[in-house]
């Protein structure tokens, strides 16, 4: 059952887009969601499921923003955010540039373009990953590039 909410409201978000799911025998992102389902077991509202990329996904209609899932996440990739701000960084990778891309094809690479472009000063790059200060963000949409595209599976190609 969906919870009727007044806008703005709080809900959990998983800071991983799923590109870290590696092919068998290859190393994936050490900072992303591992699909352990601890968050699912903890959520009393059935608001979390594992998506087709093996990553936890929150249904904002069901989530009440209690933060129970965030407390049990072993990777610390779940946090509660203000849903008035629709811009979120769905990445927790701490590697920089090519090393990050090697682990995850949709990783934030810590280049700082978003930080330089944000006129409100709401975005900072910390540990090679963009972080949005929601209390400052204007949700202007200028940096929709932060909403990373769908991941593709990594696979080893042999010739």
In which residue ranges do the predicted regions lie?
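Anionic-ligand-binding alpha/beta catalytic cores of soluble enzymes and soluble regulatory domains
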Residues: 74-77
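Conserved small/polar residues in nucleotide/adenosyl-binding loops
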Residues: 146-152
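Positively charged, low-complexity/disordered segments
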Residues: 152-153, 157-159
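Ferredoxin-like iron-sulfur electron-transfer modules
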Residues: 1-35, 40, 46-67, 79-110, ...
């Amino acid at each position: 059952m969906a919870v009727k909410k007044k806008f703005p409201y709080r809900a959990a978000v998983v800071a991983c887009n799923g590109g870290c799911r590696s092919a068998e025998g290859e190393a994936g992102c050490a900072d992303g969601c591992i699909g352990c389902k601890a968050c699912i077991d903890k959520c009393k509202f059935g608001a979390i499921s594992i998506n087709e990329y093996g990553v936890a996904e929150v249904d904002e209609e069901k989530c009440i923003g209690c933060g129970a899932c965030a407390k049990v996440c072993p990777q610390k990739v779940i946090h509660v955010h203000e849903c008035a701000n629709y811009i979120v960084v769905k990445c927790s990778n701490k590697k920089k540039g090519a090393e990050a891309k090697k682990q995850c094809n949709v990783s934030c690479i810590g280049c700082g373009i978003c930080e330089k472009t944000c006129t409100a000063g709401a975005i900072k790059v910390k540990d090679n990953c963009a972080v949005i200060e929601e209390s400052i963000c204007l949700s202007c949409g200028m940096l929709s590039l932060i909403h990373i595209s769908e991941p593709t599976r990594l696979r080893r190609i042999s010739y």
